[in-house]
């Protein structure tokens, strides 16, 4: 098995979530109409993975550490003994109106520019199909593995976003 320790921990936490919240998740999913059984199954997996991440990085504690560490993703990675990608994904979830975090967006992109994972709670519009804007620093990060690159992206509507990019192993 070639999975990293962090990936194994997330899978174990998702299994714990399934044991503890399977009934509630099934009940929640029953409120929606899915185009196929497969799409319902994938949605359930996504919810279980979300619960798994919440077990490893509980909301209040994670939010507190984000503020304390000024959203330094590598320090958060070390603090919670998780992967960089898991931390990057988790910061996008800090959207509780009672305890909000900074709005983040998240992309996972391969060497060919294909987007394989996307979350945008920052307001930035990420293409649903194809690749992201070729000027985004996500592509230049591929030329400098393991090094965080920061850039300010100015959109056509005048909105500005700070974008960080880094390769993950």
What are these regions (language model features)?
Residues 1-169:
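Conserved binding/catalytic microenvironments
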């Amino acid at each position: 098995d070639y999975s990293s320790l962090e990936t194994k921990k997330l899978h174990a936490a998702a299994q714990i979530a399934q044991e503890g919240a399977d009934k509630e998740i099934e009940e929640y999913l029953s409120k929606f109409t899915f185009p196929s059984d497969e799409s319902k199954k994938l949605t359930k997996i996504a919810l279980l993975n979300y619960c798994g991440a919440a077990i490893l990085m509980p909301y209040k504690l994670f939010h507190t550490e984000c503020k304390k560490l000024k959203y330094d993703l590598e320090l958060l990675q070390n603090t919670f003994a998780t992967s960089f990608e898991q931390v990057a994904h988790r910061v996008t979830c800090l959207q509780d109106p009672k305890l909000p975090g900074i709005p983040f967006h998240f992309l996972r992109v391969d060497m060919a520019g294909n987007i394989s994972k996307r979350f945008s709670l920052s307001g930035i519009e990420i293409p649903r199909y194809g690749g992201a804007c070729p000027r985004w620093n996500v592509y230049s990060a591929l030329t400098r593995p393991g090094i965080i690159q920061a850039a300010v992206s100015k959109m056509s509507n005048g909105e500005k976003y700070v974008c960080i990019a880094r390769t993950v192993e």
